[in-house]
Amino acid sequence: MTPSYFTRYENLAMERTDSGILTVRFHTDGGPIVFTGQAHHDLPRALAEIGDDRDNKVVILTGTGDLFMDEIDGDSLGEIFKPGEWDKAYWEGRRVLQRLLEIEAPLIAAVNGPATVHSEYVLLADITVASEDAVFADKPHIGFGIVPGDGIHVIYEELLGINRARYFALTQQRIEAREAETLGLVNEVVPKDAVYDRARAIAEQLAEKPQLFLRYTTLALRQRLLRRLNEGTQLGMALEGLTAADLAYQAQSAA
């Protein structure tokens, strides 16, 4: 029987093989996802259900078409300059990354194209396979004028090192696939039409291993990231909320 959560979330298409490989594909109406307030609301809840399902031995995250995630509908996030609304965003934002890491199964990212919105989702994976045309960036935060404090700052600092991460955040640097591989952001770069197949092949190899080994190994390897995210997102998202409120104040003052 197909679990009910497979079809519960409008921006997530899910399917699972008999060997326990769950593929989670981001989309909007069957095309590349446009990240919205609804997606922000749904993700922590979907990830909790995925993590609770012990039939998921390996999880693959991927996008649709030529993009992983490259567009965001800022207006759909609501009036996040209001404390009550930001509290909701704060709760959801912190738990997305926590719950990704709390899935007790190997997480493989198949980055099928540019990841300039929430690229931290794929960089949190245990194994990241990228298309040769993939690009990693943080388009929304600096573009909107708000602090990148939702955890993306932690992930890039862990993977790039402190100085490179600060440069990345402040300059809106775009890191192309081959450079990302050299810097250690991704594990493999493959032709575009081979991304999912390569991720699936790795997943099939892992799915043959004992499930307790898979669960407990991923648990052991993620402890540092969990600690860093817990520390970094508390202050980071508070500062992000302050800058969101300031943007609204500046707009009101200029009106």
Predicted regions: what is each one?
Residues M1-L22, T28, G65-M69, D75-S76, ...:
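C-terminal alpha-helix plus adjacent terminal tail
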Residues D55, T62-R95:
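Glycine- (often His-adjacent) and acidic-residue-rich active-site loop
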